[in-house]
Curated annotation (Swiss-Prot):
Its main location: plastid. It comes from Cyanidioschyzon merolae (strain NIES-3377 / 10D). Its EC number is 6.3.4.19. This is tRNA(Ile)-lysidine synthase, chloroplastic. One of its GO terms (molecular function) is tRNA(Ile)-lysidine synthase activity. One of its GO terms (biological process) is tRNA modification. It holds the Pfam family ATP_bind_3. The N-terminal region contains the highly conserved SGGXDS motif, predicted to be a P-loop motif involved in ATP binding. The gene is tilS. InterPro entries: Rossmann-like_a/b/a_fold, TilS/TtcA_N, tRNA_Ile_lys_synt, tRNA_Ile_lys_synt_N.
């Protein structure tokens, strides 16, 4: 069943200039956990892209492996390729789990010559990240939904225009077999404390808190200059590149490196408010944050 949310999802691809034929001629890596957000991503991509999809699932040993089995059978049902990663030892922190996922995703991206990594981060995740950065006294820059890893390979987060409530509605409408991971309710993780304790408290103080702040974050994320491909960025006048980079908060040396050294691609690490420049000829040596 085709819904208006499919149109919004497809508009994200058009905004990011990902609707060209060459974008769909390579495989797409989909990070699928089995939760409602990731299954929405899988359903959208399966309906709109139709082929060249690779489902990637990570098992951090936080709970039983039944979620991996469910994602595996769902991939088989949709006739999609499947990749499975399981840690040798249990991972104890969110930061280690994040680094483990992205390290393997980026390595798999280069090994398979895939076009992009797609993750199922929503506006609700962006709000939690914003609060986490604010509480941790880091500059709250939010999440970039498109990051170029090399000249043609990207990290794409197409669900940032949706909230968790909207993805829940989508799973109900399409009868998607979502998996509720027990680790999402463990208060030992800071993100779960924000999700289940702080945000409900703030919404109780101000019922419009979630809507207002999410709208402000979305307005910043949807800046069209953020999603321009590298060749479009390099074609902009130098004075305009300088003005945009200054608004992003880059230092003078970073601006000079961005404008005058075209062999580097820009990767933004939103958790530490720094910019790293990655040599396209190498594989990967940089951090990416949720």
């Amino acid at each position: 069943m085709y819904t208006p949310m499919h149109n919004k999802f497809q508009n994200r691809f058009q905004l990011a200039n990902l609707t060209h034929s060459h974008s769909f001629s390579h495989s797409w890596l989909l990070a699928i956990s089995g939760g409602q957000d990731s299954l929405c991503l899988l359903k959208f991509m399966h309906d709109l892209v139709h082929h060249h999809l690779v489902v990637v699932h990570f098992d951090h040993r936080w709970s039983c492996s039944l979620a991996a089995l469910r994602v595996y059978y769902l991939s088989r049902y949709m006739h999609l390729a499947w990749r499975y990663f399981r840690t040798a030892l249990p991972i104890t922190t969110e930061q280690d789990a994040r680094q483990y996922r992205y390290a393997n995703l980026i390595q798999l991206l280069y090994q398979t010559h895939s076009h992009a990594i797609c993750t199922a981060h929503t506006a609700s995740d962006d709000l939690e990240t914003y609060l986490d950065q604010w509480i941790s006294l880091r500059h709250p820059e939010g999440i970039w939904r498109l990051c170029h890893l090399s000249g043609s390979q990207i990290l794409f987060r197409p669900l940032l225009h949706l909230t968790r409530a909207q993805t829940h509605w989508f799973t109900l409408v399409h009868y998607l077999p979502i998996w509720s991971d027990v680790s999402n309710y463990q208060i030992t993780f800071k993100r779960n404390q924000l999700r289940h304790q702080l945000i409900p408290f703030l919404k109780n103080l101000n019922p419009r808190f979630h809507t207002t702040l999410s709208a402000r974050l979305s307005a910043r994320i949807l800046s069209p200059l953020i999603v321009y491909p590298w060749h479009v960025w390099s074609s902009l006048p130098i004075w305009l590149q300088y003005q945009i980079a200054t608004q992003w908060g880059l230092t003078l040396s970073q601006i000079q490196q961005l404008i005058y050294n075209n062999k580097y691609e820009l990767a933004r690490s939103s958790s530490i408010n720094r910019f790293s420049f990655c040599d396209s000829s190498r594989s990967y040596h940089f951090n990416l944050a949720l």
